[in-house]
Amino acid sequence: MDHEPGKPWFHGSPVELRSLHAGSKITQNRALARAFSHKPTFVTVSHAGEIRHNGTEQGHLYLIAEDVQAGDVTPHPRTTMAPGEEWLTTRELRVEHLWVTVPVPVPKKQLRENELALLAGQLDSL
């Protein structure tokens, strides 16, 4: 469950930021960070890597603007993502705003109501 040294790190948020505090979620998967920028309550990633979510807010995609060392991140202890996809920061990190993200109402990317109910039921059984 290692991260890839030298590969960029990203953070998605509906809020404008200058830095992240310790405990913030980051990922090396830019598309996943973009999905999180829309403040979804559910995110799924298929085995083929297709990301679907129910987020509807305009958001912001950020690049972590400094080197991230092994001690700067720890695997998210309660993630539902594949190992290595979602990390928590252990210290404050500067970010660079890349762009504003707008949720695209593409049926293929949005989770349907029956899919959301199924996911909610799976979480309740954990």
Model-predicted regions and their roles:
Residues 1-8, 13-24, 28-126:
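Conserved NAD+-utilizing ADP-ribose enzyme module
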